[in-house]
C-alpha cells in the first residue's frame, strides 16, 4: 500500500485526486487508508503520487 511520509507539507493536492477517496487530512499530514487504497489499479499512474509536489507518497 502507499503511505504519506512526514515530509508532507499539508498542501492538499493529493486528496481530490484519489479515485477511491482513500486520502484524508490527518493532524499534521494527509493520510492514506490502506484498506481503501488500490494504488490506482488499472490507471497509467498513481494519481496522488503524480500530483504530490513534495514527492512524499511512497510504497509501504
Swiss-Prot record:
Q: Where is the 4Fe-4S ferredoxin-type domain?
A: 2-27, 28-60
Key words of the record: 4Fe-4S, Electron transport, Iron, Iron-sulfur, Metal-binding, Repeat, Transport
The cofactors it requires, by name, are:
[4Fe-4S] cluster
Binding-site residues for [4Fe-4S] cluster 1, renumbered to this chain: 8, 11, 14, 52
Gene3D superfamilies for the chain = 3.30.70.20
- Any GO MF annotation of the entry: metal ion binding
The reply on keyword Repeat is yes
Which SUPFAM superfamilies does the UniProt entry name for this protein? 4Fe-4S ferredoxins
| Signal sequence residues | none
Pfam families membership: Fer4
Give the cofactor binding note. Answer: Binds 2 [4Fe-4S] clusters.
Q: Where does [4Fe-4S] cluster 2 bind?
A: 18, 37, 40, 48
- Please describe what this protein does: Ferredoxins are iron-sulfur proteins that transfer electrons in a wide variety of metabolic reactions.
Q: What is this protein called?
A: Ferredoxin-1
Q: List the taxonomic lineage.
A: Bacteria, Pseudomonadati, Chlorobiota, Chlorobiia, Chlorobiales
